[in-house]
Each structure stands twice: as C-alpha cells, then as structure tokens.
C-alpha cells in the first residue's frame, strides 16, 4: 500500500496467462489462463462443483474447455478483442481473484516492446474510464525482467506464449531501434506439436485439445543441443520415447516430436515463418549495438518467459552464438574464441520474471506522484497523459 492506504496492483497480461498480485510481493498472487469461453450447448447447469455460465473465464474456462468455445483475447502480445479483454479484467479484479476496489488502487501494467501506441492508449482509457483506478503506469516487459535480475544493462530474450522479443536495455532504458521481434512463441510451438502428433496418427483438433497439447509440451519437450544427433537417436532407437496419459485416460507415445517442436524457435522455416531463428536474431541484435556496449550485452543475456523454460535451451543458444561469432566476427580464427566472453542467465523463476520486476518497480515508486498517471490528469488531458511515461516506455 502507499501512504494513503491505497493498494498497488501489478498485472502482467500475457497472451497465454495473466500473472497478477501486489507491489512488493515476490510471487504473483494469481496465475491463470488468459482465455474466455462460451458454452457450445447449454445441456447441464453444473459440472462437478463448477457452475456453467454463459461466459467462463480463466481457470474455470480451462477446466471445462471441452464444453466451451474458447477464445484468447490477446494474440502476439497485443489485445485483439477488447470486449473479451474486459471480461478477463473483470475476472482479475473481481471476487474470483484479486477482489479489489479499483477506485482506490493504483495499477502497474506491462506491455511488449514495440507495442502499437493505439493499443497502449486504449489500455489506459479502459483502466481510467471503466475501472477508475487512481493511478496507472505501463512498463515495458524486458526492462522489468532486468530489474528482477538486479541489472540495468543487458539483453533480454523474452519468449512467452504469443511473441518472442529480443530487447537490449542500457542503463534502465530499452533501446527501441535495436529491439527485434520474432512472431514465434509458445502458442506456435504448441500448434506445431499438434501437427507433428497428427503425423504420428494422433488427432487433436478441438479448441480444448490445444490446452492438452500445451501440457504435453510443457512436460516433455526440450531443445536439442546437436540436432543431427537427436534425429539419429529418434530414428534408430527408442530412447526418446515417453508415454503421456491424456485427460480421458488414453495413453499416447511421444518421441522425436519432443525436440522437433521447439526447434521452430531456432529454425522458423519449419513452421513457414520467414526470417532467422532466435539465436541468429540475438547475435544480429548485439552486433548492431554500439561497439562499446557489445561485450556488456554478451555478458548479460537474460532469458525470460515460459517459452525459455525448455531444458537445453540456454546451452543451445550459447553454442549457436559462439558459432556465429566465430564465423562472422573472427572469420574462423578459433584461437581468438577463448577471449570471447558470453553469459546466459536463466533464472529458475523466469516464467514470472516480468511480474517480479513489476512488483519491485511498483513498490519503489508507490509514493512517487510524478511516476503514476493519475485519474485527475487523465480527466484533464485524455490519452495525452501518456506523455508522462516519457522515454522509458517507448
């Protein structure tokens, strides 16, 4: 709370999950799927102890997903369906989750780098007009990740459910001209895994199956260090085969798909996306930075977001970066490679890094009036109040 006794809320609206809680806490109070579902047919009023309503949100929508038409209001980190997004916020602030009186609270929200201004304006408008928060701040996700890691300078590789960003931050300011975006993230890997499992003869086609395959992915997928070697193992042995029990009791076997699905992050062409993979994009980003800052960036690469949780991802990233540096900078001179210092930080709680950084920032700033956009300022200036966010949130 601030000195006036107002709660300070932190809400990290991801494409796949909402992480919300309070300033100063070191874990989100609530984490739930960012989905909204509507019953396909109204047959029963209750399933187990969950009442079926015309509109189901979050955890309940996820549990009853086989009976619902489910929608994600956000796609690639950007709100696509504002009506559903409001339902999601009603659920977040209402009795089911935070249960707060929004009029007497401040809120820190997060947004992806390179977020369209229109999107940010609309978020601020909804926060002040619909929920009437007393203060609002919108922070860039990558900067919050570094705060959570106790750094002011570094490169964040943030890969969530909807979008992957590579975002260099220098002395606490994100560098928009160097920020790169890759529209491949958790959701695309899940889709690709569905396709790969289909080739094995398992059909997952209902919108509810998507959640099931996501769970398979989280449990079994990993990033191969040496892709040729993994493929050889998959073809010639059964070492990689694991069984997975589906919600209906059926058991399926998953083998080479375990590393083939996340490989799309490194080789986008596998899912028909043009452009370079995450390792090369990271290399290009750092090489495009000012020559004096490059070595700092190579030494402070921070992973963030659920799609960086694959076992094997940090070591594969390091291997590819060294390879690219050797070929393109050192022109093959192996002798000099030993001088090349690189460090990839993979904090164990990186799934919630953005929230943690937001909780730290909101706590430090809770009483600083010049930090928050206030309801009064919004009433006077409208969306021009965003100018107050200044350069840090470009």
UniProtKB/Swiss-Prot annotation:
Q: What is the official name of this protein in its record?
A: Actin-related protein 2
Gene3D superfamilies the record matches: 3.30.420.40, Actin, Chain A, domain 4
Question: Per the record, a Pfam family?
Answer: Actin
Q: Spell out the GO cellular component terms annotated for this protein, sorted alphabetically and separated by semicolons.
A: Arp2/3 protein complex; cell cortex; cell projection; cytoplasm; nucleus; site of double-strand break
Identify the keywords attached in UniProt to this record, alphabetized.
Actin-binding, ATP-binding, Cell projection, Cytoplasm, Cytoskeleton, Nucleotide-binding, Nucleus
GO terms for biological process, alphabetical: Arp2/3 complex-mediated actin nucleation; positive regulation of double-strand break repair via homologous recombination; positive regulation of transcription by RNA polymerase II
Homology family = Belongs to the actin family. ARP2 subfamily.
Q: Which residues bind ATP?
A: 160-162, 214-218, 305-310
Q: Any idea what job this protein has?
A: ATP-binding component of the Arp2/3 complex, a multiprotein complex that mediates actin polymerization upon stimulation by nucleation-promoting factor (NPF). The Arp2/3 complex mediates the formation of branched actin networks in the cytoplasm, providing the force for cell motility. Seems to contact the pointed end of the daughter actin filament. In addition to its role in the cytoplasmic cytoskeleton, the Arp2/3 complex also promotes actin polymerization in the nucleus, thereby regulating gene transcription and repair of damaged DNA.
InterPro entries linked? Actin (IPR004000), Actin/actin-like_CS (IPR020902), ATPase_NBD (IPR043129)
Can you say where in the cell this protein is located? Cytoplasm, Cytoskeleton; Cell projection; Nucleus
Kindly list the GO molecular function terms attached to this UniProt entry: actin binding; ATP binding
Determine if S-adenosyl-L-methionine is one of this entry's keywords: no
Q: Does the keyword Acyltransferase apply?
A: no
Source organism (scientific name): Gallus gallus (Chicken)
Instruction: Check the record and name the PROSITE patterns matching this protein.
Output: ACTINS_ACT_LIKE
- Where's it mainly located? cytoplasm
Q: How does it assemble?
A: Component of the Arp2/3 complex composed of ACTR2/ARP2, ACTR3/ARP3, ARPC1B/p41-ARC, ARPC2/p34-ARC, ARPC3/p21-ARC, ARPC4/p20-ARC and ARPC5/p16-ARC.
Q: Which SMART domains match?
A: ACTIN
